[in-house]
């Protein structure tokens, strides 16, 4: 057999291998989610969050550096990246089964004993055990590996989205706690000054023991808040170090929370299904479903005959010097067919497992879409509520601070008691602390909205 004949045979085998597949058609998914966003979700002609780079969304340069450090050093993200490399390698291994494995061989056979010593030399090129994929078993296994690779890659993008959002939220939390600590420490100093005055008046008989006790209560309350916030700030720093993969430069840490840190989170423009399908976790679930579908095709193909081809062409000679002389050519062609007859129900069990895996993947895909809709709807609803809370909280702080100033003036004029002044100070202090907590919740929810809409994958939009 000439080499050209062997090549023609291999080409024919490859063509036949691409003829059919027993995988079922991809299942149409119609998850039970509303066709529109909740009424409180304001619509706007804005870009999708997935198209907004995280450097465009997080506008503070210090925060950008912290996020960049986290993306470079975070161990969880590193594991996700390595999983992508592993899945890519597994796909390449599986894909290699779709083409013949051609190998060059060389052999020397020397025999002796009572008879004279004989030598035989051979060299050739051949194909070993190439499966003629008439029913799509190998192709479906390759498709399943490809979809698994796509799913792992989508999970890697989802890991990056989560890391960006968690790092930004932790950074803002540190800033809010740092600002609350400054307010608490300033309040402690003010209350301590008031306590010294109250003690002096009490010694002169100018105030009651109740007034002195209430002042001490305010001092200890503020000291407790300051101690708690110092501990919380240390925990915030540790959380940031874990996310960033190492200690941060103190110059990158915020000392307050500012509304200018974030760009406004874009509300979703379009139908829920269109927006949610851009989320990497939903994309990963979809690829898992496609992989499970392909595995059904491979399990079905296992019921049919398997045809393998082995062939070689080369040269053989009793002398090494004459190995490639005329008349020394040798060839072999060995087709093999395997027909499953009895395997104790193994093939049916494998098919049942593949069908169950597909049904599980379908349920998980539907759940991921429903969960994505709920997360987005919750963030949209909370966005409106927190905007209202922030506006109301600002008015409360302004009113409390004005009441504190008026109470101080009336106390200085002898019109109000010291207890009334202490109540006004306590109200102003609590209002300031509550305002910072509301601002943090407002910005954290904007980060959540950005994340659940699929934002944070690109560095720049």
Placement of each model-derived feature along the sequence:
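Sec/SRP-type N-terminal targeting helices
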Residues: 79, 95, 132-160, 210, ...
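Short, acidic/charged, Gly/Pro-enriched secondary-structure junctions
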Residues: 78-96, 105-107, 290
């Amino acid at each position: 057999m000439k080499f050209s004949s062997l090549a023609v045979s291999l080409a024919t085998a490859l063509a036949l291998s691409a003829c059919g597949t027993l995988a079922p058609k991809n299942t149409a998914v119609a998850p039970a989610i509303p066709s529109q966003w909740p009424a409180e979700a304001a619509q706007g002609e804005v870009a999708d969050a997935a198209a907004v780079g995280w450097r465009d969304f997080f506008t503070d340069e210090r925060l950008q550096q912290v996020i960049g450090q986290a993306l470079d050093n975070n161990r969880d993200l590193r594991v996700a990246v390595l999983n992508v490399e592993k899945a890519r390698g597994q796909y390449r291994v599986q894909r290699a089964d779709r083409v013949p494995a051609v190998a060059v061989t060389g052999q020397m056979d020397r025999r002796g004993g009572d008879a004279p010593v004989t030598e035989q030399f051979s060299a050739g090129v051949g194909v070993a055990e190439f499966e003629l994929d008439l029913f799509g078993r190998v192709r479906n296994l390759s498709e399943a590996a490809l979809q698994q690779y796509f799913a792992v890659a989508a999970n890697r993008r989802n890991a990056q989205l989560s890391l960006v959002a968690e790092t930004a939220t932790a950074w803002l939390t540190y800033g809010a706690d740092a600002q609350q600590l400054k307010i608490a420490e300033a309040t402690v100093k003010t209350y301590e000054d008031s306590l010294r005055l109250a003690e002096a008046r009490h010694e002169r008989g100018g105030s009651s023991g109740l007034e002195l006790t209430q002042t001490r209560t305010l001092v200890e309350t503020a000291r407790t808040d300051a101690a708690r916030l110092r501990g919380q700030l240390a925990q915030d720093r540790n959380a940031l170090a874990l996310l960033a993969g190492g200690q941060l430069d103190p110059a990158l840490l915020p000392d307050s929370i500012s509304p200018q840190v974030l760009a406004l989170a874009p509300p979703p423009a379009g139908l829920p299904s269109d927006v949610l399908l851009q989320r990497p976790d939903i994309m990963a679930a979809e690829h898992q479903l496609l992989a499970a579908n392909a595995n059904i095709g491979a399990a079905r193909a296992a019921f049919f005959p398997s045809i393998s081809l082995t062939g070689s062409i080369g040269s053989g000679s009793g002398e090494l010097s004459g190995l490639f002389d005329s008349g020394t050519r040798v060839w072999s062609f060995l087709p093999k067919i395997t027909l499953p007859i009895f395997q104790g129900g193994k093939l049916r069990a494998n098919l049942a497992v593949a069908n169950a895996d597909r049904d599980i993947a379908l349920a998980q895909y539907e759940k991921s879409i429903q969960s994505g809709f709920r997360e987005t709807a919750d963030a949209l609803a909370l966005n409106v509520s927190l905007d209202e809370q922030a506006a109301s909280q600002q008015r409360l702080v302004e009113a409390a601070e004005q009441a504190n100033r008026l109470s101080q003036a009336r106390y200085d004029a002898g019109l109000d008691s010291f207890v009334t002044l202490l109540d006004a100070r306590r109200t102003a202090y609590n209002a300031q602390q509550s305002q910072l907590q509301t601002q943090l919740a407002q910005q954290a929810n904007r980060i959540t909205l950005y994340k659940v809409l699929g934002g944070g994958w690109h560095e720049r939009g």
